[in-house]
């Protein structure tokens, strides 16, 4: 399984250790998204930055859409299925399946590891960006509902 992690809050007033963890996750700016494997190391990092990001399990269909719509190659070149087939030797669905299953990491592909997303259409949840998802906000773990947020942000 793989997590999609999206940075929600900015960098003003962030403690140094949390800023370092966000940097290790490659979440430098708001609305940036990374796909990470579900390991104990990453889970600990997510717990540390839970007040600045939201995350959940991404499904294959959403990852395919994310790669095709917001994926970029070095030089900020757009991605299409033919380019992915040519560079990786597999189609987009197969690539997404392997990323989700943890067989390959996104950084091992020619794609950039960070997806730059738009702010969500119709905004975040009613509670805003300072409350956890469990009480109606936007932060922290949200499970399968990350796919709905990603759809709003693509």
UniProtKB/Swiss-Prot annotation:
UniProt-listed InterPro entries: Ribo_uL30_ferredoxin-like_sf, Ribosomal_uL30, Ribosomal_uL30_arc, Ribosomal_uL30_CS, Ribosomal_uL30_euk_arc, Ribosomal_uL30_ferredoxin-like
Pfam name, any one: Ribosomal_L30
Subunit structure: Part of the 50S ribosomal subunit.
GO biological process terms, semicolon-separated: maturation of LSU-rRNA from tricistronic rRNA transcript (SSU-rRNA, 5.8S rRNA, LSU-rRNA); translation
Keyword flag Cell division: no
GO molecular function, one term: RNA binding
Entry keyword annotation includes S-adenosyl-L-methionine: no
Annotated protein name in UniProt: Large ribosomal subunit protein uL30
Highest taxon of source: Archaea
Organism: Methanocaldococcus jannaschii (strain ATCC 43067 / DSM 2661 / JAL-1 / JCM 10045 / NBRC 100440)
Entry's Gene Ontology cellular component terms: cytosolic large ribosomal subunit
Keyword annotations: Ribonucleoprotein, Ribosomal protein
Assigned protein family: Belongs to the universal ribosomal protein uL30 family.
């Amino acid at each position: 399984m793989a997590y999609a992690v999206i940075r929600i809050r900015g960098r003003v007033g962030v403690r140094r250790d949390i800023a370092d963890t966000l940097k290790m996750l490659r979440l430098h700016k708001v609305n940036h998204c990374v796909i990470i494997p579900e390991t104990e190391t990453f889970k600990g990092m997510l717990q540390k930055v839970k007040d600045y990001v939201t995350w959940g399990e991404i499904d294959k269909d959403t990852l395919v859409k994310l790669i095709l719509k917001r994926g970029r190659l070095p030089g900020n070149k757009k991605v299409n299925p033919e380019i992915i087939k040519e560079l990786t030797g597999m189609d987009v669905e197969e690539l997404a399946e392997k990323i989700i299953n943890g067989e390959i990491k996104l950084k091992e592909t020619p794609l950039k590891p960070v997806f730059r997303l738009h702010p969500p259409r119709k905004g975040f949840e009613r509670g805003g960006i300072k409350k956890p998802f469990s009480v109606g906000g936007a932060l922290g773990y949200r499970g399968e509902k990350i796919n709905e947020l990603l759809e709003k942000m693509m």
